[in-house]
Amino acid sequence: NENDTEFTFYMRPGMKWSDGMPVTTEDVRFAVEDVLKNEEIYPVFPTRYRSLFSVEGTPCELTVIDDYTFKLTFDQPYGSFPAHLAISDWVQYNDLLKPAHYLKQFHIDYTPLEELLPLMEAESIAEDEWFNLFNTKQMTHLSQICNPQKMDHPVLTPWYMTSHDAGVYMWERNPYYFKVDTEGNQLPYIDYLRSDLISERETLMLRALTGEFDYPGERASLKKLPLMREQEDAGLINIYMARMHRLPYSARLNYTYPDPVWR
């Protein structure tokens, strides 16, 4: 609204999780009312869903309008909310949109404790800590798609993990991914991916320089650029200088510098 206290969201009808189940406002309602507002799962309600992005702010209120429309209301203007929703803490959609059909089987409000106990025992979780079982199953962060414990968690990403072994992760194409190209072809194009977890940057660079990888990620070092150019000239690799949100350097401004001109 004009006061930046109400934000209405319109979801995409027909959108599906990677297991084929529809994405609806029930996933939002479950995420807000049964997860974020559950004090055992979240002893402290997340700051970015409080007024003014403050720990002292009032938690938002959710209104479900229909299967694909919902509204979040704050008691004070919160104009930066969309920006925080987009970039804050690399959370992505994971705390506002959860696959309710999957996670309800680990939630005490939907599954009796006696059914949860065998799962808790398998994870060495105390009998009075069902919420720790839930937290091992839910995703709260973008990076957790790489967590083998959460491999069965439905996602909205173009690929999902199918196996892992000794630092090698295998991924398959999400057949329900919501994007298409300009010709209407379903994305992504690539059916399978393999990711190798390499702890040493030097090892990564040596393997990348021989063309062993299709993509070494953002761990590639600019210090090695001259050597990489030589390998590119030899036809072993291709270098693309991507325009990214992350850079190998940063500039921090000192707002309290004593010289008023510089300040």
What do the PLM-derived regions correspond to, one by one?
Residues 2-44, 50, 54-64, 73, ...:
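Extracytoplasmic/periplasmic ligand-capture domains
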Residues 10, 48-137:
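Surface-exposed binding/hinge segments that line
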Residues 140-142, 148:
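Secretory-pathway ectodomains
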